[in-house]
Amino acid sequence: EVYVSDKQLAAQENAVNVEMGIVPNGYAWIFPKKDHLSCGIGTALTKINKFKDLLYYYLDNHPNTKNYKKLILKGHPLPHSYSVELVINTERAVLVGDAASVVDPLSGEGIYYAMKTAEIAVKHILKKISKNLSLDNYSDEINKTIRSDLYYSDKFARLFYKFPKLTYDLGVANPIVNKKFQDLLRGKTTYKEMYEILKPIYSNKFTQATLKLADKIKQKFIK
């Protein structure tokens, strides 16, 4: 939580910033709120040196957060697993949301999955009460629907965070890919469907772009 001047708050009022290249294997963001800005950084790396310094650098150099009045730091790991054999229940309890390790590996988003797993949990709890059906069915449904799709999100995440500029140029900046991600956010498609559509289109382009980049590096550094 970052408290800034009224002028800075107004400047960010209708804008959302998601910026690559500042954090290794991750991104930085700024979201407007009623009386402050929600700012932060995230990374797919399990360990990174001087992580807080990257946040301070970002805030000190962005016009809408520079010389901020007050900063409240919060942070926690985002657990995710795409193992379709993960058990997230007993016969008396179920895990939902972050506790069930259903965070999107690509975006770090977890609110949707928290709500979705809670909805599915209620269904299976009611079946447990009314028909004495096993809550193992809850784990099975989460693994077959949500977690199996996060497997493909992880594929996108590994590619994007390893080659951010390349994947941005070939994918994000492309209107077709952009539209697919919009459909994903609206719940009109899944990561698996996106992967199956985009892989044959971009795998060859990505290989060619990678080879060109490798050739440039070779020419510059290897004599």
Please report, for each region that a protein language model flagged, where it lies by residue:
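Mobile, glycine/GP-rich and aromatic-enriched active-site lid/loop segments adjacent to catalytic centers
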Residues: 22, 31-36, 63-66, 72-77, ...
